[in-house]
């Protein structure tokens, strides 16, 4: 008799995705981050749902409702801090996942890669809107500064900003719509994740060597299920440690001051996971130029498959490209640091140099190095 998991209309979809899925035998721990992102998304939706039961999206009560959650709701403090730090975990896994894709040439699966870029934008938008909800000083001023960037769009900019605000400044209408969208977006993200997986399973997974692994496949279960569970345990341990011992480590103390439109914080900055893009934005003196550079800092990922010049897919056997990749990582860490610093000497020039280097490595140095390595292969 055929197993029910192979015949049942619903179970066979799950079976072909997570049980009998043929997977390359050589996948390293860098392939764990996809499933970790799934767990992060689940944790965020679950904690967010319970937080939404107690949160009020009104400018007069939003800050107090968050305080009420932390003080009066049973384990409300735990929900709030898991949700806030879970977002940080989400982005750590996201950046590792994208980095893995860049290093091992996973971007050659263009549909999967492009859906992934869409997912990245959607998650970033969700996180930004979520940061506005506690209605602290950094929430309010962060929302004001970032939404105001749209006014740089020629002709329609100012109208667009006022349309998003629902008035002439960030106010009650803005907070209400941000809450509505923050609630909606994770479900759109979940739908996109399914499309992402659909396209991935059309081609099968890439592997560290970048060589087709059709002759050497193993079933996903039990080999990679057990490997993923180990990943879950490590990540959830790290998240629990962060939440229970230093929940405010990655947050901004200014967000414990209720939003006040009459007093600007000394340094307006977003959450740490947006600092690299914020540094690129600030490094260009022109407003529209800064906005374009900000968008391009993420959208540049879509160009990567087009400028792939190497005869090899993965960087596993390309030492010069590896050096460039890790230089890119160092540049991103530098940008993250600069994004959190005040706009003064020497931070301005460091930020500008790092921004130039970021685009230079991806657009020019990587393709040239690939061509050089192709030439060296003939020796």
Swiss-Prot record:
Annotated residues for binding of heme b b566: 97, 196
Organism listed in the record: Ectophylla alba
Pfam families membership: Cytochrom_B_C, Cytochrome_B
Transmembrane regions: 33-53, 77-98, 113-133, 178-198, 226-246, 288-308, 320-340, 347-367
Main localization, broad class: mitochondrion
Membrane-topology descriptor: Multi-pass membrane protein
Ranges in a coiled coil: none
GO molecular function, one term: metal ion binding
GO biological-process terms attached to the record: mitochondrial electron transport, ubiquinol to cytochrome c
Other facts noted in the record for this chain: Heme 1 (or BL or b562) is low-potential and absorbs at about 562 nm, and heme 2 (or BH or b566) is high-potential and absorbs at about 566 nm.
Co-factor binding comment: Binds 2 heme b groups non-covalently.
Similarity comment text for this entry: Belongs to the cytochrome b family.
Keywords: Electron transport, Heme, Iron, Membrane, Metal-binding, Mitochondrion, Mitochondrion inner membrane, Respiratory chain, Transmembrane, Transmembrane helix, Transport, Ubiquinone
Swiss-Prot/TrEMBL cofactor(s): heme b
Compartment(s): Mitochondrion inner membrane
Binding site for a ubiquinone: 201
Protein name stated in the entry: Cytochrome b
GO CC annotation terms, alphabetical: mitochondrial inner membrane; respiratory chain complex III
Binding site for heme b b562: 83, 182
Subunit structure: The cytochrome bc1 complex contains 11 subunits: 3 respiratory subunits (MT-CYB, CYC1 and UQCRFS1), 2 core proteins (UQCRC1 and UQCRC2) and 6 low-molecular weight proteins (UQCRH/QCR6, UQCRB/QCR7, UQCRQ/QCR8, UQCR10/QCR9, UQCR11/QCR10 and a cleavage product of UQCRFS1). This cytochrome bc1 complex then forms a dimer.
SUPFAM superfamilies reported in the protein's UniProt record: a domain/subunit of cytochrome bc1 complex (Ubiquinol-cytochrome c reductase) (SSF81648), Transmembrane di-heme cytochromes (SSF81342)
Function according to Swiss-Prot or TrEMBL: Component of the ubiquinol-cytochrome c reductase complex (complex III or cytochrome b-c1 complex) that is part of the mitochondrial respiratory chain. The b-c1 complex mediates electron transfer from ubiquinol to cytochrome c. Contributes to the generation of a proton gradient across the mitochondrial membrane that is then used for ATP synthesis.
